[in-house]
Amino acid sequence: MIPQFKNRFEKLGFDELSPIQSAVYEPLKNGDSVLGLAPTGSGKTLGFVVPVLERIAPGQGIQAIIVAPSQELAMQLTHVTRSFATLVDLKVTSITGGANVKRQLEQLKKHPEIVVGTPGRILNLIEDHKLKPHDVQTVIVDEADDLLEGETFDAVRTILQNVPSEVQMGFFSATETPILTELEKWFGTPVTRIDVRDIDHTQGEVRHGLLEVGNLKKAGMLGKLTSVKQFKALVFFNHVGSLQQTKSWLMHHHVPVATLSANQRQT
């Protein structure tokens, strides 16, 4: 790792690379295509950002594209990538759906070396000849299990068909779906599989449990679980009505709760 990045790592409080960061560094730095499998929160983002940036030369066009499944994740990736890229005089631009196209086109005119974005918007700008991919040497597909299905799968494939044939590919995911076992078949390039899920305990050992609870008793069970010391939870619902009923029950019993749903006002 170059000194600038090593110093940034140390300032962020990291004493050593995580298993996924260590395992993918050399293959990515050498230009190999990889599938990186690691638990959520294990440092996958820096695992690909650092070696990819070390291969890029300033002022020689867009050399890396990082594809994310959502605008929110793309913005997070942009922030992380930019925090390292600025150390070596590289520019990063975010290209996402739902954002102002004219502003994005203005950013592309500043000749960034790295583009981070969502597949639909990236593909649209390539097809409109606004984003020129002929210098791209690396394409990273983050949350690959999510992106490589449905319409986004087709968009990712088309993006890769528009970049040079010798492009390096990186696919990263916390879970391995069937499509991730057939990457060479779909993308025509040998991909080295790197799986550290069994050895990476960065976030501690995850224990799974199952409780069979009737629908009418689920809110009460949540209330009981809150008696566990330092209990925090994300609870997913199939219907907004059930979400609101459970929220009302918990609030009535003085349990702190917040909700997020698609029909809430966005700010």
Provide a role label for each language-model segment.
Residues A38-S42:
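The conserved Walker
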Residues M1-L37:
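Conserved pre-motif I regulatory segment
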Residues G204-W249:
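Conserved interdomain hinge at the start of the Helicase C-terminal
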Residues K102-Q107, Q244-W249, V255-T267:
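Conserved helicase ATPase core of P-loop NTP-dependent helicases/translocases
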Residues I2, Q60-E127, D135-T138, P256-T259:
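Conserved nucleic-acid-binding Ia/Ib motif block in the N-terminal RecA-like helicase ATPase lobe
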Residues V34-L37, I65, G170, L234:
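Short hydrophobic/aromatic beta-strand immediately N-terminal to the Walker A/P-loop
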Residues S22-V34, K44-G59, V80-F84:
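Walker A/P-loop NTP-binding motif
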Residues N124, K132-I199:
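Post-DEXD/H (motif II) to motif III coupling segment of the RecA-like Helicase ATP-binding lobe
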